[in-house]
From Swiss-Prot:
This is DNA polymerase III subunit alpha. Its EC number is 2.7.7.7. It is an enzyme of class 2 (transferase). Disulfide bonds: none annotated. DNA polymerase III contains a core (composed of alpha, epsilon and theta chains) that associates with a tau subunit. This core dimerizes to form the PolIII' complex. PolIII' associates with the gamma complex (composed of gamma, delta, delta', psi and chi chains) and with the beta chain to form the complete DNA polymerase III complex. Interacts with SSB (sbbA) via the latter's 6 C-terminal residues. DNA polymerase III is a complex, multichain enzyme responsible for most of the replicative synthesis in bacteria. This DNA polymerase also exhibits 3' to 5' exonuclease activity. The alpha chain is the DNA polymerase. Its main location: cytoplasm. GO terms for molecular function: 3'-5' exonuclease activity; DNA-directed DNA polymerase activity; nucleic acid binding. It comes from Bacillus subtilis (strain 168).
Length: 1115
């Protein structure tokens, strides 16, 4: 007797199953099952993955779900019911049932809906905890019989079954079900109620249940859970040996269930054109209109290219798609929403350019349409659009309103139990302390996709910890079993689907955000179904551009059209050449700054190339690219015929489009064929490489190139196929970078205001940008209750600090402050508390405003303001309570105010600490400032100077603001530090050998005199600390000195005069010794020749006398 599992939960029943879909189907195949069902709780998240996996193994997929169903319209109680799709109609009804359960009626399905969606569905009671089972266990047999017949009347005879599960040990219930079946004539079927795959996975399942409940295993009641594994046929035959008809019923049900999900077809929606015009004709009309708008009277190249692209688009039936995108982009522009110049290969389309979907002229920038839409490789077009992250939702709302709520949805994504999360979660339910679980998780290398098995192999320390503890070994073992399972559902950052038919005919939906549904299928499975997917991306840099340009327009009455700026502007490229790129899209990293300083870019083309090259692999070509640009290395072309293709990149292959053009030029490939070649060779499979080599060489020979030349060029194509970057994307994103650089170069104050406002809430970034602003000469004004706004603002040639950037001052409080001061400025603390609504004024907020300096203008010291808070609040409360009566007698000139509670100002160290706490930065001063003269005398440089002197040994005076100690793989301690001074912040690292010596002085808040050097690591400047001592322990005898050796050949009046001039130009506190080689004599120079021993003076002396002849000795 055969059997089919009809009640199966996968990991998509979130935290209620330890069975991954692929593994579930693989095990069913191994056990020889011909059919298998999937019946997750309320959802169909895994349906397509399950369907494909079953089809791939020749198993009949039975798609179902477990629905909660209300017993009546009162909606008081809902009970589970297993529903299986018999047919495509049944599958579509399941889509609707799941959508209802996940959006309109999360508690359960109303009887009327169950009746509406019953067609094509087989229903099975769950075996326990269902409505029928609950009635039977309550002794209500007759009611159970009545309810059973009602269910049968809904689904039809032969489409409603009782689940019979004797293996769960409830003998009384099992006998009652058999009796009920006999009395009602409704058949029983065997079901397994699968929640995990193998019996040894039971502990993992119990663990998941505890994670879901937020309990520890020791707290949960000890349940004698039945085995809920995917039992083999032999075991099921043994369980049901006395009732083989139940096994047979499962097979009969499976034979009825035949669903055919259409995969691979395209479901492009149609665009509602005016007057019934065809989409092809309408697209042509608006493209011609756009071409004239862009170019006036375009030349023949543009007309030919446009006609070619339109022909391809029409032939591939994508006219509606372009019209849909054109329409919502048009709406965005009409609403003043900034849109990106393009993203990905879409920037290579002239149609997209003339429709104002992109802002990149593909002919001017040598971009290829075939890289976007290849007529020789049919695939869905993919236009990703960037919007400001604050306005992206407006565009999605427009699309939903135009096409209807049931035709537009955002896309689901799943957070999984990755290695670290699995270890932490399992550790918690096993009672491992959070600290220990965290320490264990931190031993897992931080790399995307890292598995627990890989982590144990790569981390000897993790392996050691696990071997030392049987409890941790158990935690690890179970974490491995649940690793990779979905933990929660969330919304994809960008994806939106659009459908001609109601989405619930194709995909189950669930509640989303802002009234927009969320698909239950993830992106890959939506593509399998042929749904049109578009990416609406929120780009912070566009928000920044929008913010800066609107400020300039509002304050300066200058409307900036970034589409018409010069991409060779001297001021812009001077800024870029200095590496002054903080806040500049994709050009901010330390490594990129270094490249820009060496490259000295002179136009957009250089930035495009750098963005394309600055990646692992292509990076190795950057030095050659720079040397060729500046004429320090000859430009070599693989063949002279390739000069026009490679001359912009000085003979270096940088872009995928160059590979395509080379194949077209030399081998006569169409650009479509060239794109196929590029894709093929990038896979690096030998048989494909050999086949394509023959194809390429054959084409070259037809065009009379030699075999050697053809092979040489093909080898280059193979080498760069993986390295080559999408030029269309590089051009578009480089334009955003150049636009921001233009704004920074020409409107630095507005740029800095916009940049600072964009990172409100991120203390580290605000701190970094404020230090940079001060370093570049921009004055930052303190926060002020009378002058500050929500954003950072420009005020009299300076930047005024934002109120919202003060900790504990929320959005509503800022609004209330702004509204209250509109009539007149606040006069004092009492006036402030009286006029700002009491819902916003509380002690915490007032303390934050006072500590930050936002109330300094009231003319009292901060300690006095703090001491007067209670009086001010009581005064405001008293007058607010009597406001109606007092208002009859008070006028503007009459006021009763209490007096300040005057007290001495707080010590400077406390004032600064409170400033740092509320602003994230030492604003008015820095704790180190009191030591600056002493530090300079000791030869210490600032953090800003140190960051500009990479790889040089330096001394610094710093405040240690953060310390993070870790253990290396070999079990040694080391530390990562955050250091600061008046000029900025910097990360530092203390390796194990140094940590052993320095750990006594490494504590947060310590003021240190330290030595080491800066290095660029992982694209960040990091200080490698070699020595450190507390500033308070500094010894005057350790004062540094500069030793200058004057070789015999240098002993001349001219050289001595130059030395004297350099010393006098860099006066300071560091002593200078001269050693005359000829006389073998050392002379200590008088104080009048003491210098500020920074890297600038040392560089000048070394340049004059030689590297080895100038030494700064310290410690």
């Amino acid at each position: 007797m055969s059997f089919v599992h009809l009640q199966v939960h996968s990991g998509y029943s979130l935290l209620n199953s330890a069975a991954a879909v692929e593994e579930l189907v693989s095990e069913a195949d191994r056990l020889g099952y011909a059919s298998l069902a999937l019946t997750d709780d309320h959802v169909m998240y895994g349906a397509i993955q399950f369907y494909k996996a079953c089809k791939a193994r020749g198993i009949n997929p039975i798609i179902g779900l477990t629905a909660s169903v209300f017993t009546d319209d009162s909606e008081l109680e809902a009970y589970p019911l297993v529903l299986l799709a018999k047919s495509n109609t049944g599958y579509q009804n399941l889509l609707k049932i799941s959508s209802v359960l996940q959006s309109k009626s999360k508690g359960g399905l109303k009887p009327k809906w169950l009746h509406s969606y019953r067609e094509g569905i087989i229903a099975i009671t769950p075996g326990e905890k269902g409505y029928i089972e609950t009635l039977l266990e309550g002794g209500l047999f007759e009611q159970a019989a009545q309810a059973s017949l009602e269910f049968q009347s809904i689904f039809g005879k032969g489409a409603f079954y009782f689940s019979y599960q004797p293996f769960k040990g409830n003998q009384v219930l099992s006998e009652q079900i058999l009796k009920l079946s006999e009395e009602t004539g409704i058949p029983v079927t065997a079901t397994g109620d699968v929640h995990y795959i193998r019996k040894e996975d039971k502990a993992a399942y119990r663990c998941l249940k505890a994670i879901k409940a937020g309990e520890k295993l020791t707290d949960a009641p000890a349940e004698d859970l039945p085995d809920l594994d995917l039992k083999p046929l032999e075991e099921m035959q043994n369980i049901y040996r006395e009732h083989p008809e139940a096994l047979q019923a499962s097979v009969e049900i499976a034979e009825q269930c035949r669903v055919d999900v259409s995969l691979g077809q395209t479901r492009l929606p149609s665009f509602p054109t005016p007057d019934g015009t065809s989409a092809d004709d309408y697209l042509t009309d608006i493209c011609m209109e756009g071409l004239r708008s862009r170019f006036g009277k375009p030349d023949e190249r543009y007309l030919r290219r446009l006609q070619y692209e339109l022909d391809v688009i029409k032939r591939m039936k994508f006219s509606d798609y372009f019209l849909i995108v054109w329409d919502f982009m048009k709406h965005a522009h009409e609403k003043g929403i900034v849109t990106g110049p393009g993203r990905g290969s879409a920037a290579g389309s002239l149609v997209a350019y003339v429709l104002y979907i992109t802002d990149v002229d593909p002919i001017k920038h040598h971009l290829l349409f075939e890289r976007f839409l290849n007529p020789e490789r049919v695939s869905m077009p993919d236009i990703d659009i960037d919007f400001p992250d604050t306005r992206r939702d407006e565009v999605i709302q427009y699309v939903q309103q135009k096409y209807g709520a049931m035709h537009v949805a955002q896309i689901i994504t799943f957070g999984t139990l990755a290695a670290k999360a699995a270890l932490r979660d399992v550790g918690r339910v096993f009672g491992v302390s959070p600290k220990e679980a965290d320490q264990l998780a931190k031993l897992i290398p931080s790399r995307p996709g890292m598995t627990l098995d890989e982590a144990r192999q790569q981390s000897p320390q993790l392996d050691k910890r696990l071997r030392e503890s049987s409890l941790l070994q158990q935690v690890y073992s179970i974490a491995r079993k649940i690793e990779g399972l979905p933990r929660h559902a969330s919304t994809h950052a960008a994806g939106v689907v659009l459908s001609e038919e109601p989405l619930t005919d194709v995909v189950p939906l669930q509640e989303g955000h802002e009234g927009i549904y969320l698909t239950q299928y993830a992106m890959d499975h939506l593509e399998d179904l042929g749904l049109l997917k578009m990416d609406f991306l929120g780009l912070r840099n566009l928000t920044l551009i929008e913010s800066i340009t609107s400020m300039i327009e509002k304050e300066e009455n200058i409307k900036i059209d970034l589409s018409s700026i010069s991409y060779s502007d001297d001021k812009t490229f001077s800024l870029l050449s200095k590496g002054d790129t903080t806040g500049i899209f994709q050009l901010e990293s330390a490594g990129m700054r270094s490249v820009l300083k060496r490259l000295k870019p002179s136009g957009l083309e250089d930035i495009v190339a750098v963005n394309a090259l600055y990646r692992p692999g292509p990076m190795e070509n950057i030095p050659l690219f720079i040397d060729r640009k500046h004429g320090r290395a000859p430009v070599h072309y693989p063949h002279e015929d390739l000069r026009s293709i490679l001359e912009d990149t000085y003979g270096v292959i940088v872009y995928q489009e160059q590979i395509m053009m080379i194949a077209s030029r030399m081998a006569g490939f169409s650009l479509g064929e060239a794109d196929l070649l590029r894709r093929a060779v990038s896979k690096k499979k030998k048989e494909i490489l050999d086949r394509e080599r023959s194809h390429f060489v054959e084409g070259c020979l037809k065009k009379e190139y030699s075999v050697d030349t053809a092979n040489e060029v093909y080898d280059l194509i193979v080498k760069f196929a993986n390295y080559g970057f999408n030029r269309s994307h590089a051009v578009a994103y480089s334009m955003i970078g150049c636009q921001l650089a233009y704004l920074k170069a020409h409107y630095p104050l507005y740029f800095m205001c916009g940049l600072l406002t964009s990172v409100i809430g991120n203390e580290d970034k605000i701190s970094q940008y404020l230090y940079e602003a001060k370093g570049s000469g921009i004055r930052i004004l303190p926060p002020s209750v009378n002058k500050s706004s929500f954003p950072f603002t420009v005020e009299n040639g300076s930047v005024r600090y934002s109120l919202r950037a003060i900790k504990s001052v929320g959005v509503s409080a800022v609004k209330d402050i702004y509204k209250a001061r509109k009539e007149k400025p606040f006069e004092d603390l009492f006036d402030f508390c009286f006029r700002v609504p009491s819902k916003s004024v509380n002690r915490k907020m007032l303390e934050a405003l006072i500590f930050s300096g936002a109330m300094d203008e009231f003319g009292q010291n901060r300690a006095t303001l703090l001491a007067s808070i209670d009086v001010a609040l009581e005064h405001a409360e008293l007058f607010a309570a009597d406001d109606d009566q007092m208002g009859l007698f008070l006028d503007e000139s009459f006021s009763i105010k209490p007096k300040y509670v005057e007290t001495e100002e707080l010590p400077l160290v406390d004032l600064l600490a409170f400033e740092k706490e509320t602003l994230g930065i030492y604003f008015s001063n820095h704790p180190l400032s009191a030591f600056r003269k002493q530090l300079t005398a000791q030869g210490a440089v600032s953090i800003l100077q140190a960051q500009r002197a990479v790889k040089r040994q330096l001394s610094l005076g710093v405040l240690l603001s953060k310390i993070k100690t870790i253990r290396t793989k070999t079990g040694q301690n080391m530390a990562f530090l955050t250091l600061s001074d008046e000029t900025g912040e910097m990360e530092a690292v203390v390796f194990p050998e140094q940590f052993r010596q320095l750990s006594p002085v490494l504590r947060e808040g310590a003021l240190l005199f330290t030595a080491g050097k800066c290095e660029v690591r992982q694209d960040k400047i990091q200080f490698i600390m070699s020595r450190a001592e507390l500033l308070e322990d500094m010894d005057a005898e350790k004062a540094p000195s500069v030793y200058i050796k004057i070789e015999s050949s240098q002993h001349s009046q001219e050289i001595l005069a130059k030395i004297k001039r350099i010393l006098l130009e860099h006066k300071g506190e560091t002593g200078v010794y001269l050693y005359y080689e000829r006389q073998k004599q050392t002379i200590k120079l008088p104080e009048s020749f003491h210098i500020n021993a920074d890297h600038q003076v040392l560089y000048r002396l070394k340049e004059l006398l030689g590297q080895k002849n100038v030494v700064l000795k310290q410690w």
